[in-house]
């Protein structure tokens, strides 16, 4: 769990996302409150519940990107899901409890990777011994093993092929699927796990010494880990630090004066209520309490309104943040300011072909103008429009770059207008092309 202050979290988000100060403040405070809660006495800690967030704003303004960057920053189990993927209990499809099961799997993977690093040195030595066994045999003399160990560490044997015994991942086991629920898994128990543990099968693989390195280290690391303790720690991390980002929540609103076809939409909202309020979900690894999992919901709310959500669900999302539509200046900043801005990406991509791409300031202004103009006349898809416009403008350069190694390609405002100006002005054409 990160111990960054809210100000530091906002400055980290500023490196990748332009504007939206209110949303950044809200998520930074929520993330810091996770850390603050863990500093409290046990009794009070149980009483402090997370303040869930509802982000409201048009598409393409940074809602999902804020969540994505927050996940990397938090170092906590994080899951992004679309609310539209779930159906009411009793209907065909995934039920909302699958969110928590998936979050537990994410946490187990995170905890395992962290613990593998702790035992990496011991696992490295054990893996080295297994490689030497494959090269010279388990009964070889100490002198022979030392000689080969020196060659192995010097990298002289990297290309040599060896046969190693590895744990079978149970690939031969048929998948157990619940009829009528594609992609659903048994929550309480996994049939594959039972047979995998009973079988304990190994298989022989023929790989190079270099390729065997990662396989054997991962296997030896797992032997040194206590799997029960690992799972228990992962569940504890989920219960105290887990974050769920519920995207497209406006799509499960039941709009006023609308009848028929919406039964399972309202049902999904009702199923989400106990999950967000706090309940216990059964997973194949054990029971997980959701009382202290932070939920961040987001939606464009173009057609529906936040008030169309069930009143109980509105009450469980107490912090409302409105994200602003992007202006021309925002579009310009998005092209240049973030660490991995679109301009930097295209320049780097062309450099791989030996082509220097020179995009002038007036070209950046022209690109921003075109994106804003098309957004206002066709459909406002926010910053995503910039990708469409950039692809259109740089289409010729991308296609012929491999034939122009060593050249410098200059893109200015005139070049932008030549390749896209007429399309942007013609609303009917841009409706289909941009």
Swiss-Prot record:
Belongs to the ClpX chaperone family. HslU subfamily. GO terms for biological process: protein unfolding; proteolysis involved in protein catabolic process. ATP binds at residues 18, 60-65, 247, 312, 384. This is ATP-dependent protease ATPase subunit HslU. GO terms for molecular function: ATP binding; ATP hydrolysis activity; peptidase activity; proteasome-activating activity. PANTHER family: ATP-DEPENDENT CLP PROTEASE ATP-BINDING SUBUNIT CLPX-LIKE, MITOCHONDRIAL-RELATED (PTHR48102), ATP-DEPENDENT PROTEASE ATPASE SUBUNIT HSLU (PTHR48102:SF3). It is found in: Cytoplasm. Transmembrane segments: none annotated. A double ring-shaped homohexamer of HslV is capped on each side by a ring-shaped HslU homohexamer. The assembly of the HslU/HslV complex is dependent on binding of ATP. GO terms for cellular component: HslUV protease complex. Disulfide bonds: none annotated. Keywords: ATP-binding, Chaperone, Cytoplasm, Nucleotide-binding, Stress response. ATPase subunit of a proteasome-like degradation complex; this subunit has chaperone activity. The binding of ATP and its subsequent hydrolysis by HslU are essential for unfolding of protein substrates subsequently hydrolyzed by HslV. HslU recognizes the N-terminal part of its protein substrates and unfolds these before they are guided to HslV for hydrolysis.
């Amino acid at each position: 769990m990160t111990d960054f202050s809210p100000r530091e979290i906002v400055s980290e988000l500023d490196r990748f996302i332009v504007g939206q100060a209110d949303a950044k403040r809200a998520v930074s405070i929520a993330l810091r409150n996770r850390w603050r809660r863990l500093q409290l006495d046990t009794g009070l800690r149980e009483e402090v519940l997370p303040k869930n967030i509802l982000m409201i704003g048009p598409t393409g303004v940074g809602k999902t990107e804020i969540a994505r960057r927050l996940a990397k920053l938090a170092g906590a189990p994080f899951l992004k899901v679309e609310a539209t993927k779930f159906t009411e209990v009793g209907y065909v499809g995934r039920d909302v409890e699958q969110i928590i099961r998936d979050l537990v799997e994410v946490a187990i993977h995170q905890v395992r990777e962290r613990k593998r690093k702790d035992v990496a040195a011991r696992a490295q030595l054990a893996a080295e011994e297994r490689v030497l066994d494959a090269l010279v045999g388990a009964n070889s003399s100490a002198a022979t093993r030392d000689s080969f160990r020196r060659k192995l560490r010097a990298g002289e044997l990297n290309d040599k092929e060896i046969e190693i015994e590895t744990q079978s991942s149970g690939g031969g086991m048929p998948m157990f699927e619940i009829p009528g629920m594609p992609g659903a898994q048994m929550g309480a128990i996994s049939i594959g796990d039972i047979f995998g543990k009973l079988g304990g099968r190994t298989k022989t693989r023929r790989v190079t010494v270099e390729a065997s390195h990662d396989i054997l280290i991962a296997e030896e690391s797992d032997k040194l880990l206590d799997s029960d303790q690992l799972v228990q720690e992962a569940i504890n991390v989920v219960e105290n630090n887990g974050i769920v980002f519920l995207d497209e929540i406006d799509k499960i609103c039941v709009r006023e004066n609308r009848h028929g076809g919406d039964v399972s939409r309202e049902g999904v909202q009702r199923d989400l209520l106990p999950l967000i309020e706090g309940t216990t979900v059964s997973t194949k690894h054990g029971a997980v309490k959701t009382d202290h999992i932070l939920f961040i919901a987001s939606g464009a709310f173009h057609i529906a309104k936040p008030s169309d959500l069930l009143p109980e669900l509105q009450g469980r999302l107490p912090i409302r943040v409105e994200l602003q539509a992007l202006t021309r200046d925002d579009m310009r900043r998005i092209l240049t300011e973030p660490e991995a801005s679109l301009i930097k990406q295209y320049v780097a991509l062309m450099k791989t072909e030996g082509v220097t791409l020179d995009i002038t300031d007036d070209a950046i202004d022209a690109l921003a103008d075109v994106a804003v103009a098309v957004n206002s006349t066709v459909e406002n898809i926010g910053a995503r429009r910039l990708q469409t416009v950039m692809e259109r403008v740089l289409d010729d350069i991308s296609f012929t770059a491999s034939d122009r190694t060593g050249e410098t390609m200059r893109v200015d405002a005139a070049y932008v207008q030549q390749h896209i100006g007429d399309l942007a002005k013609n609303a009917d054409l841009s409706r289909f092309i941009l």
